[in-house]
């Protein structure tokens, strides 16, 4: 009949597609498995607090020639499988990941997105990927042949396999909160006005800030999300999921997803952003906001409180934090150090101690959004020398990595990643505009990792590496419950409130961590017993016994460890220092 309205669309459940994701493909997934795929075991991670997450964009990782990756693999999934990569003697790419000691790679979106034309690779287009088109298909621009539906699947499995073989888990950044297209999306073409939230006036609500938001509270949208996540977790052996704008999803759906992932593997990480990009019509008490965290206690949330206390407010580039001279940041910082759970020594407002358990706190001071930590310090501490700013950066790293919760680091942060911005014609350079604070579609000049910086700032990398090794070496830095945090983490008294120190103690093991935000030496006290300097401001150890007190250098963090003793009838001997 002439009044029948016909639409053509790719299946919303399509798991493979052709170039640019316009047409679905039927694929035998068994034929896409790399050799040895079935034999590779997933890395073990008992608890989120045992993870050290490293955020990577597939293209950034290897696009620059300094990556040492084969030219045809640069910017592609398969770059992660290139072995032995170096730049002038320093490890790059996967060799770098192994050397640093992180446990998980968090990949910015690799699901098929709309804003790079896969048929024109010579245009060198770039996008972070938060523009979802097909939720169950892989992005083709990261494959060596976007026209072959199997190619991207096989090559992404090679990426996963290469990381798993080296004991590194894979976290996917998933963007179920909106679609890039609204009326033209596969959701609307398949079942109009169901998969998206609609306002009372019939318009699309826009809690994402991207033109629409999906309706996770609708039964079939919820089912779609669960089915999709189960597919990624089983077919690709994914080890974790990070939810973009997670607060747009209703709490009930978030909890059901956690239950479903537990059935596959309870060690799968699940965390997300506890905020939205705009106003949603769903009542705030039903949404997975950070302040509702006690209603979904098994899911992690980005800790913007500790982020801003460390380096200053994100949206004012000149704003300073604890490491760069803000003397009012120490209170918020203490809460973050204790995993953002209620602590017997912190008598602040309930919302400040927002986490139900320390496993919920994703501690960070840099991610793909906004200025890198180094660029932020170059703006807010522009009058300080580079050497002083390096001290600030290392102090920030110590706070993130040694706090209770799950540490999260951006690719290249460990060697002072910078995102230089290309100025527009006629634009005069100033303190702020020479750095990109929103590089979502900036070229490789801005976004790609320049591995020569690792060579240039090797001492910074070595410090991050030493911090990660220290964290992984003792469960005291990785406590799972608020009860443990309250029993075994004690803030120590200092005459100066801005000098922060705390003691971690259990079963005869004792650490004292001190943070000095001043430009001069500061003295700190020690508990009873003999200690040695486990980690100095360079990441090194000094076995000389110390008792009573110690001096912390300017703008530095240091860690002391009590020397264990073994008692015999007439003799007490120190045990081996480690």
Regions found by a protein language model. Name each.
Residues 1-5, 572-576:
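Short, small-residue-biased leader/transition segments that mark boundaries at the very start
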Residues 546-567:
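C-terminal beta-strand-rich structural cap/linker in extracellular carbohydrate-active enzymes
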């Amino acid at each position: 009949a002439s009044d029948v309205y016909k639409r053509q669309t790719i299946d919303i459940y399509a798991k493979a597609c052709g170039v640019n994701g316009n047409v679905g493909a039927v694929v035998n997934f068994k034929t896409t498995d790399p050799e040895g795929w079935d034999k590779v075991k997933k890395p073990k991670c008992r608890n989120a607090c045992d993870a050290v997450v490293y955020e990577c964009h597939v293209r950034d990782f290897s696009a620059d020639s300094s990556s040492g990756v084969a030219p045809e693999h640069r910017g592609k999934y398969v770059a992660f499988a290139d072995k032995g990569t170096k730049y002038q003697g320093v490890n790059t790419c996967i060799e770098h990941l192994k050397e640093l000691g992180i446990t998980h790679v968090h990949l910015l979106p690799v699901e098929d997105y709309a804003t790079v034309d896969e048929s024109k690779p010579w245009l060198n287009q770039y996008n972070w990927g938060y523009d979802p088109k097909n939720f169950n298909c892989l992005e083709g621009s990261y494959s060596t042949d976007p026209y072959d539906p199997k190619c991207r699947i096989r090559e992404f499995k090679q990426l996963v396999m290469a990381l798993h073989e080296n004991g590194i888990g894979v976290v996917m950044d998933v963007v179920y909160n909106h679609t890039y297209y609204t009326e033209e999306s596969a959701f609307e073409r398949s079942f109009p006005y169901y998969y998206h939230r609609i306002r009372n006036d019939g318009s699309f609500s826009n809690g994402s800030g991207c033109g629409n938001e999906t309706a996770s509270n609708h039964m079939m949208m919820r089912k779609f999300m669960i089915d999709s996540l189960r597919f990624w977790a089983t077919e690709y052996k994914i080890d974790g999921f990070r939810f973009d704008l997670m607060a747009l999803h209703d709490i009930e759906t978030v909890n059901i997803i956690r239950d479903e992932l537990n059935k596959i593997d309870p060690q799968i990480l699940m965390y997300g952003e506890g905020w939205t990009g705009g106003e949603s019509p769903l009542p705030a008490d039903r949404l997975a906001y950070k302040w509702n965290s006690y209603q979904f206690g098994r899911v992690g949330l980005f800790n913007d409180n500790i982020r801003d206390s460390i380096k200053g407010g994100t949206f004012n580039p000149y704003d300073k934090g604890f490491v760069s001279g803000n003397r009012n940041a120490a209170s918020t910082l203490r809460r973050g150090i204790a995993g953002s759970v209620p602590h017997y020594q912190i008598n602040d407002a309930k919302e400040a101690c927002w986490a139900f358990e320390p496993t919920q706190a994703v501690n960070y001071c840099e991610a793909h959004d906004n200025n890198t930590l180094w660029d932020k310090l170059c703006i807010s501490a522009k009058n300080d020398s580079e050497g002083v700013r390096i001290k600030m950066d290392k102090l920030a790293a110590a706070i993130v990595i040694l706090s209770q919760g799950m540490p999260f680091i951006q690719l290249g942060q460990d060697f002072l990643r910078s995102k230089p911005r290309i100025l527009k014609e006629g634009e005069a350079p100033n303190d702020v505009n020479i750095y990109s604070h929103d590089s979502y579609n900036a070229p490789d000049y801005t976004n790609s990792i320049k591995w020569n910086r690792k060579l240039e700032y090797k001492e910074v990398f070595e410090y991050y590496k030493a911090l990660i090794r220290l964290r992984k070496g003792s469960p005291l830095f990785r406590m799972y419950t608020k009860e443990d945090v309250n029993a075994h983490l004690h803030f120590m008294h200092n005459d100066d409130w801005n000098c922060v120190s705390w003691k971690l103690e259990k079963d005869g093991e004792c650490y004292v961590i001190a943070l000095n935000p001043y430009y001069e030496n500061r003295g700190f006290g020690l508990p009873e017993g003999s200690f040695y300097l486990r980690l100095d401001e360079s990441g090194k150890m000094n076995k000389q016994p110390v008792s009573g007190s110690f001096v912390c250098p300017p703008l530095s963090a240091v860690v002391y460890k009590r020397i264990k003793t073994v008692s015999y009838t007439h003799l007490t001997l120190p045990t081996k220092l480690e």
